[in-house]
Amino acid sequence: MAGTVEDVRDENYKEFTDSPGAVVAYGLATCEPCKTYDPILEETAAKFPGIKVGKAKMHVPGRCREIKKTHTFETYPATHFFANGKPLLTRESVVEPAELVALTSDHLIK
């Protein structure tokens, strides 16, 4: 069963990343690897119900202006791990399912 991947945008970014554990994937509609990442994010959300998993759609006009001002992305998708508002880890490109589960477990589960 897949979990819920939340929509992350400027309006909810701080609240989302301030949670005890959050994974944010940044992507573009034109990015083929970003599309293949969606089911992996859903599986991760299902395995970790206490962790917020979200996706920031960087291509949608006006949704992520502030996020773009504070973050630089070399490639998409990019995945950031947060705990209580603090960035813990960044991964570029698609993170394979087993690695995403391991990183989430190792860095966000107390």
Show where each model-derived region lies.
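Short active-site neighborhood of thiol/selenol oxidoreductases, capturing the structured segment around
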Residues: T17-A29
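Thiol-based oxidoreductase modules, predominantly thioredoxin-like and allied folds used
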Residues: V5-R9, Y26-L28, D38, E42-R65
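Residues at alpha-helix caps and immediate loop-helix transition turns in enzyme cores, especially N-
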Residues: T36-Y37, E96
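N-terminal "domain-start" segment that seeds a small globular fold
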Residues: M1-E15
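Non-catalytic, surface beta->alpha helical segment in thiol-disulfide oxidoreductase systems
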Residues: E74-K110
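Short cysteine clusters
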Residues: C31-C34
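Short amphipathic alpha-helix with an adjacent loop that forms part of the alpha/beta core around
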Residues: E15, E66-H71
